Amino acid sequence: MYEALPGPAPENEDGLVKVKEEDPTWEQVCNSQEGSSHTQEICRLRFRHFCYQEAHGPQEALAQLRELCHQWLRPEMHTKEQIMELLVLEQFLTILPKELQPCVKTYPLESGEEAVTVLENLETGSGDTGQQASVYIQGQDMHPMVAEYQGVSLECQSLQLLPGITTLKCEPPQRPQGNPQEVSGPVPHGSAHLQEKNPRDKAVVPVFNPVRSQTLVKTEEETAQAVAAEKWSHLSLTRRNLCGNSAQETVMSLSPMTEEIVTKDRLFKAKQETSEEMEQSGEASGKPNRECAPQIPCSTPIATERTVAHLNTLKDRHPGDLWARMHISSLEYAAGDITRKGRKKDKARVSELLQGLSFSGDSDVEKDNEPEIQPAQKKLKVSCFPEKSWTKRDIKPNFPSWSALDSGLLNLKSEKLNPVELFELFFDDETFNLIVNETNNYASQKNVSLEVTVQEMRCVFGVLLLSGFMRHPRREMYWEVSDTDQNLVRDAIRRDRFELIFSNLHFADNGHLDQKDKFTKLRPLIKQMNKNFLLYAPLEEYYCFDKSMCECFDSDQFLNGKPIRIGYKIWCGTTTQGYLVWFEPYQEESTMKVDEDPDLGLGGNLVMNFADVLLERGQYPYHLCFDSFFTSVKLLSALKKKGVRATGTIRENRTEKCPLMNVEHMKKMKRGYFDFRIEENNEIILCRWYGDGIISLCSNAVGIEPVNEVSCCDADNEEIPQISQPSIVKVYDECKEGVAKMDQIISKYRVRIRSKKWYSILVSYMIDVAMNNAWQLHRACNPGASLDPLDFRRFVAHFYLEHNAHLSD
């Protein structure tokens, strides 16, 4: 906003006015500090005034007191020094005299030094009341006044009154029928208020309402009392400190009928331009009169775009010795050819509406009193996260210990399910019905008579499972007799029937597809699989989150460091043994949901989604492990707020300037050496360890102790016994292989039959994963007499082909 400069200005004949622009960050800083202090004060009062009668017993009373104290002091956000400062501040405010306590408590204080500053300001009575402006109307009595123009809304200007300033409220006159008439008479008292808005918003076109001029006058005594009551005590200490440092100089002179100049006593002085008759009338009555300009009959309205452009021209001027004049008039009788040739005091001067810039050479006074203001620099992006504070100590996690009982696995053990029943926990009747219905719907849309049944669909799945451990170059060879006699397949389903069903296999309605989802044709099946996987997943403490690959040479996705490097990338959350709990095919980062946090990135938001999936089973302290693609200090802080523990390797550019030992320097140390730091605000540890190589890890739950002794190999593959290994490294090594174990199991007996549809490879992947999960449950339910993955798959494939053979005839 623009605000009148309270300091001296050069005196010249053009009546130029110098104003300053307020800092637009005032309101944001004040609102955030006042809101935080207000919330903290409420928590303190609730803690101090808590009554024993509010609880139902001593145990509950103690728990509520502890919770209220936690909400007040917030130990997870404040250090010990900050908590001590809060307690000292509270006691300091308590011992103050009663007449000072109400004055001090109106400020959002955060430390004792701020309270002392407020008390000193109250005692000395010195304080900056903001940048203010007033207007003197020339006349016999010279009453100080401030003009307020009704109908004008300048978003770039805000004036605040000095104590004791009389206000004048003016509105433009109606279009006169003859000569201008003088306006006089008593007027009720009122105060002028100008709207204060952001200076970067678009300027609003000033418009004067065609109403008769009205004048509101206050005496100096009444105005002084009103302003003294409000004063500036409502401003916070931070806002007052900012008042003198964030102003930008601009120029403005509002003179539809008058000129405004800055006098040496720092007050606006309005010079009234009237005719000789009106001057005589003003002298006789002893009251200042304002000239009412008639409407120009042949004037041309000024376009809104032009008005806004002129306002923006003045607003964007660089500070310095810049002085400008702005003439604002009603758009109803404003034109670009407004002149003052008919006025006796200034016949030669011609000025256009909202135009005219001049530079004052008389700037010696300003240079003596004010420092040079540099041009506005480009704003740098400021992170919303506070600066990290690192300390070298071990972590002290406050997570509860793991004590959950897996009742679902106990029920499966008691039921003693066979491999087929375990597989159908995931491909249940609901899933088969979904596939059958969508396949028949798709075939009918193509005018194909199919009418496939659930029994036939199970036969098709039996052939697909059989192809995983009995491979042929062509799928037609499963029905040949010459050298690959497969009576089991021939008796189960005819070749042409299999080809017809397999070519029309479908999983979603083409009439209701989400174009933003790349895998919309598989989305119903993916949701059904994720629901069943989570329903029967073992309830464990540790889980692994990583990337997997579904082999497909038509894909342009590449993943280095995996057995399968080309295909579809899939995000997987598994147990430490390889049971898949949740998966999601990779899509571009542009497909992220609106409610996801952009600061966490794609990998961080995927981990948060997996954590939410686990928390659906219960609020347990799960422990997630993942690699450096996902890990960041912000992610571990967000997981800690959800009550989820996490550990992972971290990249160098995500350590938040943690002062760990340099990698090159650590290579000169002995193997087993490690360095670590704690982030004090969120209690997150970073550790760099030199073992087989140098790795950096981050955790919100596991620290250094206990330190273990392990063996490793050097560069020549020679074993080095007994080197130190922190506990954080041990936990990560034990939990990081979950996804790799799943990939290893399903890679041995993958489904080999594929169709021409691009998503058939993903359907085969889901069948293999369901078989892996069923085998994991089989091994957990029968630890001593379990089948290996091959025998388990053969059992399911033979069952589907044998028990549904007669249905295809």
From Swiss-Prot:
Q: Where is this region: Disordered?
A: 170-199, 271-297
List residues of the SCAN box domain.
44-126
Question: What GO molecular functions are on record for this protein?
Answer: DNA-binding transcription factor activity; identical protein binding; sequence-specific DNA binding
GO CC, sorted alphabetically, is: membrane
Q: Does the keyword Phosphoprotein apply?
A: yes
Question: What keywords tag this UniProt record?
Answer: Isopeptide bond, Phosphoprotein, Ubl conjugation
| Glycyl lysine isopeptide (Lys-Gly) (interchain with G-Cter in SUMO2), cross-linked positions | K218
Q: Per its UniProt record, what PROSITE patterns does this chain match?
A: SCAN_BOX (PS50804)
Asked whether the UniProt record includes DNA damage among its keywords, one would answer no
- List the SUPFAM superfamilies hit by this protein, alphabetically: Retrovirus capsid dimerization domain-like (SSF47353)
- Kindly list the residue ranges recorded as spanning the membrane: none
PTM annotation (Phosphoserine): residues: S360
Pfam families reported for this sequence: DDE_Tnp_1_7 (PF13843), SCAN (PF02023)
List the GO biological process terms: regulation of transcription by RNA polymerase II
Under CDD domains, the record lists: SCAN
Q: Which InterPro entries match?
A: PGBD (IPR029526), PiggyBac_TE-derived (IPR052638), SCAN_dom (IPR003309), SCAN_sf (IPR038269), SRCR (IPR001190)
Name of this chain's protein: PiggyBac transposable element-derived protein 1
Q: Which organism is it from?
A: Homo sapiens (Human)
> What is the gene name?
PGBD1
